[in-house]
């Protein structure tokens, strides 16, 4: 399947690092380094716009290496790029580490994962919802079933 991309000057197509990779790496399309202080965030351009077919989305996800080595993650991960969006994909990076992180021009900053999506009809009901072992247990309750 092909997704057609429009590239700004200096940007490059997303690339899969291996034949089994789920996420395609995207790079920072910046001319100068950007410093992200500990506890801060920055919106980093990629220079990529994508013609996403109806029924698909692109999820923007953290790169595991940046997360484990530096504490740098994609905020709101996964971020969603909807099929009807045609603007530039930009990445919100957050520095959860203890040191300033420098985003260099051309650095791999995130991964794009293509996923099928389906819109459904949400219907209000006054009936009880189907019973499950988990029931109404929320955050932290999946291991208690």
Swiss-Prot record:
It comes from the Bacteria. It comes from Chlamydia muridarum (strain MoPn / Nigg). NCBIfam families: dut (TIGR00576), PRK00601.1 (NF001862). PANTHER family: DEOXYURIDINE 5'-TRIPHOSPHATE NUCLEOTIDOHYDROLASE. SUPFAM superfamilies: dUTPase-like. This is Deoxyuridine 5'-triphosphate nucleotidohydrolase. Its EC number is 3.6.1.23. It is an enzyme of class 3 (hydrolase). This enzyme is involved in nucleotide metabolism: it produces dUMP, the immediate precursor of thymidine nucleotides and it decreases the intracellular concentration of dUTP so that uracil cannot be incorporated into DNA. It catalyses: dUTP + H2O = dUMP + diphosphate + H(+). Gene3D superfamilies: 2.70.40.10. Keywords: Hydrolase, Magnesium, Metal-binding, Nucleotide metabolism. CDD domains: trimeric_dUTPase. Its cofactor is Mg(2+). The keyword Magnesium applies. Substrate binds at residues 63-65, 76, 80-82. Disulfide bonds: none annotated. The gene is dut.
């Amino acid at each position: 399947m092909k997704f057609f991309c429009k590239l700004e000057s200096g940007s490059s197509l997303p690339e899969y690092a291996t034949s089994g990779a789920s996420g395609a790496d995207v790079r920072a399309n910046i001319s100068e380094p950007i410093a992200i202080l500990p506890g801060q965030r920055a919106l980093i351009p990629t220079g990529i716009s994508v013609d996403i077919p109806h029924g698909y989305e692109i999820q923007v996800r953290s790169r595991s290496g940046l997360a484990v080595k530096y504490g740098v993650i994609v905020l709101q991960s996964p971020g969603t790029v909807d099929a009807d969006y045609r603007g530039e994909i930009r990445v919100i990076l957050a520095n959860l580490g203890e040191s300033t992180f420098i985003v260099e021009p051309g650095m791999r900053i995130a991964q794009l994962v293509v996923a099928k999506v389906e819109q459904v009809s949400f219907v209000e009901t006054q009936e009880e919802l189907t019973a499950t072992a988990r029931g109404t247990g929320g955050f932290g309750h999946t291991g208690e079933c």
